[in-house]
């Protein structure tokens, strides 16, 4: 271990593993360490089921009705991949897809007035949806056509909207859309967690709705993908990429000290040895004095013996409860997967409800989601602090990732990865640099 590296990475969460893979592909000499004996850090999948019970101090362990413990892989952080999103691009460009198998998530639903409805995102679905009345449907259809045709480089498609200055609130007004439609457009299509976006320039929202529609168009049932055997497969896939390009991995390796000289990182001390480096990447747990708390997320893992009601017996789905529907500032999310994804015993389902904490009674905040899941066989409640770095790391060359937020997709994580890359390399992250061969997620060559 007494060696000189370009980059040392501490923690094997998804953000760290992707950056480690990218740096190795770029020819950097990388040492990657984790104090845990398993991959994934905060974003790991726990197996066997007995481990999950232990982790949550449920000492009696799982009952026999839960089946074989090793048939379970339970994600600690529930997220899906947008089929056309940034993480899928990273997987394709690096060919990490060869280590993973994906399934399309069967449905995307939105909550309104105590019931759940399928999210309409095409013209045909919008016209058939019970979410809106007839006239509302026509207006919404017009809006979707406008978004689909919108091209920020072609003013002819603007229809009087300025992408840089017109607010999204004004765009909704232009199409005369009602509050319910605005709710599900902003939260179930554009996937915002709060309503802060309404007064921002509309371009980002339009692009987010496009991403949703393009992701949906790709594979049909929903815009989301999920890997067989759980999300813990993702960091491991990028770790393999790093190893192929000469990266060194050490699990179960305690970190005693991060060594600084004149305010710059020069190495990491572990078990009496020092590995030297020019740059350091880590998650917040390795540098508590260089991060600040930015909020909390509650995640409740629920094991069920039945599909969720009114989802057409889907074996996987996402439900978004827009904040307006339950008098909150932040949305509540449910991600559900099952035995069909090799993450649970036969006939069992895992639904994870999560939201940004707003009160002193977080469990009560998630109640509207839990009501949709009844009866629940077993609950595991986790309340996590969210951390972010206090500086950009350019001076110290210590680059810290942000905690995983309450969103149910990886777009914010990818933004963090691109941001850290830019600060480390001094140039913007370019997917083209990582290109090995262009196939789609299911291994078929692109047309």
UniProtKB/Swiss-Prot annotation:
Entry's Gene Ontology BP terms: negative regulation of axonogenesis; negative regulation of protein targeting to membrane; protein transport; Rab protein signal transduction; vesicle-mediated transport
A Pfam family that the UniProt record links to this protein: GDI
UniProt keyword annotations, A-Z: Cytoplasm, Golgi apparatus, GTPase activation
Disulfide pattern: none
Chief site of localization: cytoplasm
Subcellular localization, as worded in the UniProt entry: Cytoplasm; Golgi apparatus, trans-Golgi network
Coiled-coil spans in chain: none
Gene Ontology terms, MF aspect: GTPase activator activity; Rab GDP-dissociation inhibitor activity
Superkingdom of source: Eukaryota
This protein's GO CC annotations: Golgi apparatus
Subunit structure, interactors included: Interacts with RHOH. Interacts with the non-phosphorylated forms of RAB1A, RAB3A, RAB5A, RAB5B, RAB5C, RAB8A, RAB8B, RAB10, RAB12, RAB35, and RAB43.
Family, as annotated: Belongs to the Rab GDI family.
Classification via PANTHER family: RAB GDP DISSOCIATION INHIBITOR ALPHA, RAB GDP-DISSOCIATION INHIBITOR
Function noted in UniProt: Regulates the GDP/GTP exchange reaction of most Rab proteins by inhibiting the dissociation of GDP from them, and the subsequent binding of GTP to them. Promotes the dissociation of GDP-bound Rab proteins from the membrane and inhibits their activation. Promotes the dissociation of RAB1A, RAB3A, RAB5A and RAB10 from membranes.
The name this protein goes by in its record: Rab GDP dissociation inhibitor alpha
Organism: Pongo pygmaeus
């Amino acid at each position: 271990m007494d060696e000189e590296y370009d980059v040392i990475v501490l923690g094997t969460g998804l953000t760290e593993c992707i950056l480690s893979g990218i740096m190795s592909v770029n020819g950097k000499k990388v040492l990657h360490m984790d104090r845990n004996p398993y991959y994934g850090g905060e974003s790991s999948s726990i197996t066997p089921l007995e481990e999950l019970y232990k982790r949550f101090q449920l000492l009696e362990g799982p009952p026999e009705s839960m089946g074989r413990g090793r048939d379970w892989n339970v994600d600690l952080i529930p997220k899906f991949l947008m089929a056309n999103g940034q993480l899928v691009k990273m997987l394709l460009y690096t060919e990490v897809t060869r280590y993973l198998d994906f399934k399309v998530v069967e449905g995307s639903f939105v909550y309104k007035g105590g019931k759940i409805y399928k999210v309409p995102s095409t013209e045909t679905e919008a016209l058939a949806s019970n979410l809106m009345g007839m006239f509302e449907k026509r207006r919404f259809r017009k809006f979707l056509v406008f978004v689909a045709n919108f091209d920020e480089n072609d003013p002819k498609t603007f229809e009087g909207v300025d992408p840089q200055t017109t607010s999204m609130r004004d765009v909704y007004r232009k199409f005369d859309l009602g509050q319910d439609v605005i709710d599900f457009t902003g939260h179930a299509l554009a996937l915002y967690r709060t309503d802060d976006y309404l007064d921002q320039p509309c371009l980002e929202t339009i692009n987010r709705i496009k991403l949703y529609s393009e992701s949906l168009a790709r594979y049909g049932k929903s815009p989301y993908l999920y890997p067989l055997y759980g999300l813990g497969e993702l960091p491991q896939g990028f770790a393999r990429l790093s190893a192929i390009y000469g990266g060194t991995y050490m699990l179960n390796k305690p970190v005693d000290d991060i060594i600084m000289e004149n305010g710059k990182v020069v190495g990491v001390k572990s078990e009496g040895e020092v590995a030297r480096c020019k740059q350091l990447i880590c998650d917040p747990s390795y540098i508590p004095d260089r991060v600040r708390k930015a909020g909390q997320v509650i995640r409740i893992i629920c094991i069920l013996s039945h599909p969720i009601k009114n989802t057409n017996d889907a074996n996987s789905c996402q439900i978004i409860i827009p904040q307006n529907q339950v008098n909150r500032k932040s949305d509540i999310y449910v991600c559900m997967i099952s035995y069909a994804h090799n993450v649970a015993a036969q006939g069992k389902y895992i639904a994870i409800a999560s939201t940004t904490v707003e009160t002193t009674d977080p469990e009560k905040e998630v109640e509207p989601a839990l009501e949709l899941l009844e009866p629940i066989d077993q609950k595991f409640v986790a309340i996590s602090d969210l951390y972010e770095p206090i500086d950009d790391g350019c001076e110290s060359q210590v680059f810290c990732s942000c905690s995983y937020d309450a969103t149910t997709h990886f777009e914010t994580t990818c933004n963090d990865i691109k941001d850290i890359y830019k600060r480390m390399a001094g140039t913007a992250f370019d997917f083209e640099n990582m290109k090995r061969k262009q196939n789609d997620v299911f291994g078929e060559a692109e047309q």
